[in-house]
């Protein structure tokens, strides 16, 4: 017996279906709107134990002195050209500078100073309570080269002051941290400070060339002594202001991990010959096609598989309404946000393993077919991938037996440090930021560059990468580029940040969440 569908039955069916769909849309809309106005993961802790007994204040004389000290540090060209080529004279001069301008640090009975690897420095600041687990602050003395003829507004090692900014190589990478940490400790010791919790300061001299003689040797020394660290703070991310569309306030991004990296060499060898009788495909052409495939077929967008999602969720309540709705509902709008992020080079680096062809070499004469062509490609690896996984994908993308793929070096992404409400290091850094920058929202982030802290993973599970330098539109070109600079006010803020961090780290326990 056949079922007969009347017009009335069909209309009733579609009416019910439409009602169900409408109800589903209304429920979905209600959930989205509700989360938009209530979603907030950046929660506050309750009453802190007061260990900041020395007020973060700088007298006019201290402000003048710290600026003079910083300028001299920038003027010393501690350049790392390569692993076999460093300015040793400058590193020796920098050692003498530290001893001269920080007399309390070098003479205090609370501070033990050691030179490691000839030019790096390890300071142990002994706390009164040996039962409290120590922490460590990192920075690096060396800088990348700077070409004085490259368009600088002031010579790169002049530390010249222009419109309230100090110009020079190392002002934001990373002498502001080197001098800021020691200047803060100097002022605390001058005011009678005795730490409760032991802490270490590690200043590497070869971070820009992988840190094998500096950071690695400091780590090995601490390991030999059985040292375990509660947390580690190194350079890395910054205070971003005006560089994220829709974000109404500045945000301090604390790097809870950093990307891995690997470099591969692609090479092609073919018989040489005269250019008057060229083969159908040259070594250059074959290699160029392989490189083009790598650039065209990018690594997958992995937004949400690393800490980058938490960055936006922690900032959601600081965006304007439309952006806030998206950030508060990434369970629904994740693909939308990820597609927007991959549209710009600076944000694309947060959502995937990046592919950068950095060197291409071939040819010896214009009328000779080259027998060999080679290219080097650098990959910065997303938190959810590995070196081996990237290598496998390179092989499948190149997919040409004539192209030899050779692994040069690399390492996996770093472990993700905790940023939970009960994580000591993250919360101490967060409080210290808010003490000095009350207008700033703190959020976890991913560091796309590499730092000395990657060598410290055996000493602590919680490693953070942050220095409170302001990062504004146009500043990305200053990192390792032309017109590197820092404002005088910002350098003073950096000194006060470390001043507070050292005192805040003396709390025995974190407070509970504010109800």
Curated annotation (Swiss-Prot):
Enzymatic reactions: an N-acyl-L-amino acid + H2O = an L-alpha-amino acid + a carboxylate; an N-acyl-aromatic L-alpha-amino acid + H2O = an aromatic L-alpha-amino acid + a carboxylate; N-(5Z,8Z,11Z,14Z)-eicosatetraenoyl-glycine + H2O = (5Z,8Z,11Z,14Z)-eicosatetraenoate + glycine; N-hexadecanoyl-L-phenylalanine + H2O = hexadecanoate + L-phenylalanine
Amino acids binding Zn(2+) 1: 173, 208, 480
Cofactor binding description: Binds 2 Zn(2+) ions per subunit.
Subcellular location: Secreted
Gene Ontology molecular-function annotations: aminoacylase activity; hydrolase activity, acting on carbon-nitrogen (but not peptide) bonds, in linear amides; lyase activity; metal ion binding; peptidase activity
Cofactor: Zn(2+)
Pathway assigned to this chain's UniProt record: Amino-acid metabolism; Energy metabolism; electron transfer; Lipid metabolism; fatty acid metabolism
Residues spanning the signal sequence: 1-34
A Pfam family hit: Peptidase_M20
Documented activity regulation: Lipoproteins are powerful coactivators of PM20D1 activity in vitro and NAA biosynthesis in vivo.
Active site, renumbered: 142, 207
GO cellular component labels: extracellular space
EC number, UniProt record: 3.5.1.114, 3.5.1.14
Keywords, alphabetical: Glycoprotein, Hydrolase, Lyase, Metal-binding, Protease, Secreted, Signal, Zinc
Binding site for Zn(2+) 2: 140, 173, 234
Sequence intervals crossing the membrane: none
Glycosylation sites: 50, 87, 118
UniProt family annotation: Belongs to the peptidase M20A family.
Function: Secreted enzyme that regulates the endogenous N-fatty acyl amino acid (NAAs) tissue and circulating levels by functioning as a bidirectional NAA synthase/hydrolase. It condenses free fatty acids and free amino acids to generate NAAs and bidirectionally catalyzes the reverse hydrolysis reaction. Some of these NAAs stimulate oxidative metabolism via mitochondrial uncoupling, increasing energy expenditure in a UPC1-independent manner. Thereby, this secreted protein may indirectly regulate whole body energy expenditure.
Name this polypeptide is given: N-fatty-acyl-amino acid synthase/hydrolase PM20D1.1
Gene that produces this protein: pm20d1.1
């Amino acid at each position: 017996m056949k079922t007969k569908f009347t017009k009335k039955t069909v209309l009733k069916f579609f009416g019910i279906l439409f009602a169900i769909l409408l109800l589903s849309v209304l429920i979905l809309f209600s959930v989205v709107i509700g989360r938009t106005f209530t979603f907030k993961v950046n929660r506050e802790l309750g009453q802190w134990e007061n260990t900041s007994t020395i007020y973060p204040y700088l007298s006019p004389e201290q402000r003048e002195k710290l600026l003079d000290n910083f300028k001299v540090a920038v003027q010393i060209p501690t350049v790392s050209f390569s692993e076999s080529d460093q300015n040793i004279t400058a590193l020796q001069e920098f050692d003498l500078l530290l001893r001269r301008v920080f007399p309390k640090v070098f003479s205090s009975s609370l501070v033990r100073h050691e030179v490691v690897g000839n030019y790096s420095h390890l300071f142990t600041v002994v706390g009164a309570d040996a039962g409290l687990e120590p922490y460590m602050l990192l920075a690096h003395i060396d800088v990348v080269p700077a070409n004085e003829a490259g368009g600088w507004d002031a010579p790169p090692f002049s530390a010249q002051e222009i419109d309230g900014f100090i110009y020079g190589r190392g002002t934001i990478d990373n002498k502001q941290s080197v001098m800021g940490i020691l200047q803060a400790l100097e002022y605390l010791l001058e005011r009678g400070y005795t730490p409760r919790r032991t802490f270490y300061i590690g200043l590497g001299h070869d971070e820009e060339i992988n840190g094998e003689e500096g950071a690695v040797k400091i780590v090995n020394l601490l390991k030999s002594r059985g040292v375990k660290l509660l947390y580690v703070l190194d350079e890395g991310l910054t205070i971003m202001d005006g560089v994220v569309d829709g974000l109404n306030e500045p945000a301090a991004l604390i790097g809870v991990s950093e990307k891995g990296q690997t470099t591969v060499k692609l090479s092609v060898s073919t018989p040489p010959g005269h250019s008057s009788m060229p083969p159908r495909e040259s070594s250059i052409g074959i290699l160029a096609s392989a490189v083009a495939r790598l650039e065209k077929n990018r690594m997958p967008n992995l937004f949400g598989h690393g800490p980058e999602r938490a960055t936006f969720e922690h900032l959601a309540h600081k965006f304007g309404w439309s952006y806030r709705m998206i950030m508060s509902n990434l369970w629904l709008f994740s693909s939308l946000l990820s597609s927007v992020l991959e549209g710009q080079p600076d944000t694309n680096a947060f959502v995937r393993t990046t592919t950068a062809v950095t060197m291409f070499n071939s040819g010896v004469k214009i009328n000779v077919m080259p027998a060999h062509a080679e290219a080097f490609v650098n990959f910065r690896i997303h938190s959810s991938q590995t070196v081996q996984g990237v290598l496998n994908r390179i092989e499948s993308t190149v997919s040409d037996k004539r192209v030899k793929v050779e692994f040069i070096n690399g390492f996996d992404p770093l472990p993700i440090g905790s940023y939970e409400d009960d994580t000591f290091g993250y919360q101490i850094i967060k409080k210290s930021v808010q003490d000095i920058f009350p207008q700033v929202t703190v959020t976890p982030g991913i560091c796309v560059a590499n730092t000395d802290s990657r060598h410290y993973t055996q000493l602590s599970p919680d490693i953070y990468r942050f220095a409170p330098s302001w990062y504004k539109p146009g500043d990305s070109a200053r990192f390792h580029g032309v017109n590197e600079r820092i404002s005088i006010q910002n350098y003073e803020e950096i000194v006060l940040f470390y001043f507070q961090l050292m005192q805040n780290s003396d709390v025995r326990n974190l407070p509970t969440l504010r109800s």
